[in-house]
Curated annotation (Swiss-Prot):
Residue(s) carrying Phosphotyrosine: Y431, Y499
GO molecular function per UniProt: chondroitin sulfate binding; filamin binding; hydrolase activity, acting on carbon-nitrogen (but not peptide) bonds; identical protein binding; phosphoprotein binding; SH3 domain binding
Gene name for this UniProt entry: Dpysl3
Description of how the protein assembles with itself and partners: Homotetramer, and heterotetramer with CRMP1, DPYSL2, DPYSL4 or DPYSL5. Interacts with synaptic vesicle protein 2 and SH3A domain of intersectin. Interacts with FLNA.
Name of this chain's protein: Dihydropyrimidinase-related protein 3
Length: 570
């Protein structure tokens, strides 16, 4: 039965709001102007606005006013082996709002062999009842057959889903074959959807995991040792190749290594329609913590693909994000408690994977990229909000400050300093992988659906107030080039006359040989005759049938001086 939504879900009554004296920052321009909002929409932008009475005025005092962040990758309330991630849609979206994010896109992860549509309806019910901010959904394809293909078509055309993820890892669970990858990409390209991939070589990982365990390596360090970055890079290259062959846009989730990031950059320079999504963790921290003596701390960093042990990787990935080689950012927020992680205390392959990052995402990027001079304020808006809205066909409703856009806004203080700590973050998780980091840049005011959610350090959220935002297919930002290439790549057979020459008969059997059509041996030379040992004259009991018979094809050569009859060296 299709989930229709609870009748009593609270909805936000939008305030009439006026932001005065702010500097509006979009992805392509910055300018000073006032903003008037009503009914959850931006109604006016300019100076000396004429607004109705009873309007609440917020003084921006020259601070930046930016579009609310869009976190394109979360796992809230995700079931896993009888457990559930500790941050549900209420706690997760509350953390998002605290960090300046006003919309999330969560991943629906169906159990293998189960219905994608039923999983989608389950996620909708959970999110509609608990989400504090707007949300959309990706659907992960955890197996593939004709029935799943029909569900994908229905979800795309009728349910507001325009992105589907496939796994190239997790052998014998979610992993798809190369043939299935080709079929899925072909299907998604025809639907105008976006093909997302979790890029790792699952076959080799399975072998490496077994090797590590045989060596007695059972702790979290085994996770990164069994998943070297070459396995991420190989899968990224393979996915790019298949996407190119099927003319399907590709979206690589969780870009964690230099090698993977470089491949995406190179492919884009060659004209491939591919997008790369680094996450809060890969932008803000490295994988040296896997070798911590504190097992719980090391386990908190376990995620796949793993964080790179190379401490220069975060700076490198931030540089590619700033240059446009990578296009947007997610958090991959997927939090388990220490007790839940501890089911893998004796076997690293059993540690539930996932890290926090939804609350820290925007501050990490500001601190690592903008404050260091790699990225300007407009690029910051692009990689935290606008590019996501464009890719998933939400623009300009989301991701832009313009008349008619949703009133999802953030007053951002570039000079604010915040020390990250699990003691005061909004996540339920006991551990924060960014613990102790001092980050520059933070939200002062967060407005979602025209309602103030964060002000003066205090959150004012309403459980269940978030709306599902459907994502329609064929995003112009993604598909304009794809459509043009389809027209150019219209294939035709070469017109030629019928061949009327001789045709080799594959059923003919040459004398003394195997049939000409046999697949054994060389296709151009007949196989030599094989001796039938059952008809051999060889005997184990004495004289052979052919003994003493000189072969016509052999010469017998005696040494100089004749034959020797030496039987002893003494």
């Amino acid at each position: 039965m299709s989930y229709q939504g609870k009748k009593n879900i609270p909805r936000i009554t939008s305030d009439r709001l006026l932001i005065k004296g702010g500097r509006i920052v979009n992805d392509d321009q910055s300018f000073y102007a006032d903003i008037y909002m009503e009914d959850g929409l931006i109604k006016q932008i300019g100076d000396n606005l004429i607004v109705p009475g009873g309007v609440k005025t917020i003084e921006a005092n020259g601070k930046m006013v930016i579009p609310g962040g869009i976190d394109v990758h979360t796992h809230f309330q995700m079931p896993y082996k009888g457990m559930t991630t500790v941050d549900d849609f209420f706690q997760g979206t509350k953390a998002a709002l605290a960090g300046g994010t006003t919309m999330i896109i969560d991943h629906v992860v169906p159990e293998p062999e189960s219905s994608l549509t039923e999983a989608y309806e389950k996620w909708r019910e959970w999110a509609d009842g608990k989400s504090c901010c707007d949300y959309a959904l990706h659907v992960d394809i955890t197996h593939w057959n004709d029935s799943v293909k029909q569900e994908v078509q229905s979800l795309s055309k009728e349910k507001g889903v325009n992105s589907f993820m496939v796994y190239m890892a997790y052998k014998d669970l979610y992993q798809v074959s190369n043939t299935e990858l080709y079929e899925i990409f072909t299907c998604l390209g025809e639907l105008g959807a976006i093909a997302q991939v979790h890029a790792e070589n699952g076959d080799i990982i399975a072998q490496e995991q077994a090797r590590m365990l045989e060596m007695g390596i059972t702790g979290p360090e085994g996770h990164v040792l069994s998943r070297p970055e070459e396995l991420e890079a190989e899968a990224v290259f393979r996915a790019i190749t298949v996407a190119s062959q099927t003319n399907c846009p590709l979206y690589v989730t969780k870009v964690m290594s230099k090698s993977a990031a470089d491949l995406i950059s190179q492919a884009r320079k060659k004209g491939n329609v591919v997008f790369g999504e680094p996450i809060t963790a890969s932008l803000g921290i490295d994988g040296t913590h896997y070798w911590s003596k504190n097992w719980a701390k090391a386990a908190a960093f376990v995620t796949s693909p793993p964080l790179s042990p190379d401490p220069t990787t975060p700076d490198y990935i931030n540089s590619l994000l700033a240059s446009g080689d990578l296009q947007l950012s997610g958090s991959a927020h997927c939090t388990f408690s220490t007790a839940q992680k501890a089911i893998g205390k004796d076997n690293f392959t059993a540690i539930p994977e996932g890290t926090n990052g939804v609350e820290e995402r925007m501050s990490v990027i500001w601190d690592k990229a903008v404050a260091t001079g790699k990225m300007d304020e407009n690029q910051f808006v692009a990689v935290t909000s606008t590019n996501a809205a464009k890719i998933f066909n939400l623009y300009p409703r989301k991701g832009r400050i313009a008349v008619g856009s949703d009133s999802d806004l953030v007053i951002w203080d570039p000079d604010a300093l915040k020390i990250v700590s699990a003691k005061n973050h909004q996540s339920v998780a006991e551990y924060n992988i960014f613990e102790g980091m001092e980050l520059r840049g933070a939200p002062l005011v967060v407005i979602c659906q025209g309602k103030i959610m964060l002000e003066d350090g205090n959150l004012h959220v309403t459980q269940g107030a978030g709306r599902f935002i459907p994502c329609s297919p064929f995003s112009d930002y993604v598909y304009k080039r794809i459509k043009a290439r389809r027209k150019m790549a219209d294939l035709h057979a070469v017109p030629r006359g019928m061949y009327d020459g001789p045709v080799f008969d594959l059923t003919t059997t040459p004398k003394g040989g195997t049939p000409a059509g046999s697949t054994r041996g060389s296709p151009t030379r007949p196989n030599p005759p094989v001796r039938n040992l059952h008809q051999s004259g060889f005997s184990l009991s004495g004289t052979q049938v052919d003994e003493g018979v000189r072969s016509a094809s052999k010469r017998i050569v005696a040494p100089p001086g004749g034959r020797s009859n030496i039987t002893s060296l003494s």
